[in-house]
């Protein structure tokens, strides 16, 4: 009897996750989790994604066998990658930074080009669990076009030295919409925000709020950081 999910090599030295039954149809399982989330049952959505991730993990070889490059052009394999990312985000939002980081590291091992943009979430996970050397290792991959880079640099400086370097605060202040979001007393996720962030071309202000809301989970681990940062921003 064939397994419900199996790893199949391709001619391009990558691998595909082939589904041989309903349980192996990762696209359908991902869609089922989205439907649960849209209906308001977020707990079930997270559980569905994590169970699917466990099946994916069981299909991949052990770590000592080396990374398995996945073929993201194959729909079921791409769904496996999307499930891994979504489950990692679930765990990050739940405060399970170590689990989320392990999931994201696995995802990047399977495709180091990072087509799903897992690196920013991984950076936040490293910040959450205080893995500053790991964060430094991937800082270059974040690039210099996101406020997340100077934000996490400031956090590392604050936690490890007790102060934020003025040059870092200046770098962050260049992201005016994000700086404004940091200074706000509240960060509403009302219908107006939902419409804006889900539009084809969300505003910079909406994107800044989205980044803040995502980063807030990690930043709240260090309760004195935000007030110290805002005090230095111009």
Where are each of the predicted segments found?
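Flexible helix-coil transition and linker loops at the boundaries of alpha-helical arrays
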Residues: 17-21, 53-77, 109-111
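Long, ordered, amphipathic alpha-helical scaffolds
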Residues: 152-234
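Structural motif corresponding to the intra-repeat A-B loop/turn of tetratricopeptide repeats
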Residues: 39, 94, 129, 160-161
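Residue-level signature for tetratricopeptide repeat
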Residues: 35, 90, 123-125, 153-160
